């Protein structure tokens, strides 16, 4: 997939490099309370990617890609790159990680199903789905992060 979108990927990579340099200029950005914001940011980005990728099963089937396996591969590569900037990485190998991403995906399916409902059943389904998604996200946030010693110099390299 990255071969087909090479130019877009290179552009996104350049944005990441610029972001990394900005983060490196002020160590306060990656310490103290900001570590929690980093964890929130990474968790939100990864969870969003997982849910969105699972919304397109025909696309992934046409490419011959399993979106769950693909997601874990992208999470691993992204985590490796983020180690150069952030003092933590997410524990994507924790059993709760995939389990809660699947719960978020199911909550998203339930929300989509509620679009075809009316009345009280639609309200209850939407409320339940949002609650389930929120609880799954909180569970993802409570997975202990892995500490990381950020290297003095940053050398980001494209992984594809």
Feature names for model-found ranges:
Residues 1-160:
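Non-heme di-metal
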């Amino acid at each position: 997939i990255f071969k087909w979108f090479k130019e877009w990927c290179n552009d996104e990579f350049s944005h990441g490099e610029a972001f990394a340099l900005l983060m490196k200029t002020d160590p306060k950005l990656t310490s103290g309370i900001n570590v929690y914001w980093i964890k929130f940011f990474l968790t939100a980005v990864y969870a969003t990617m997982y849910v969105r990728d699972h919304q397109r099963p025909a696309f992934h089937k046409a490419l011959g890609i399993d979106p769950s396996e693909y997601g874990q591969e992208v999470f691993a590569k992204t985590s490796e790159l983020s180690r150069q900037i952030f003092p933590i990485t997410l524990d994507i190998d924790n059993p709760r990680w995939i389990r809660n991403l699947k719960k978020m995906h199911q909550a998203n399916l339930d929300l989509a199903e509620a679009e075809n409902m009316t009345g009280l059943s639609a309200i209850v389904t939407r409320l339940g789905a949002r609650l389930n998604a929120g609880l799954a996200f909180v569970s993802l946030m409570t997975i202990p992060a892995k500490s990381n010693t950020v290297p003095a110099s940053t050398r980001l390299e494209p992984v594809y």
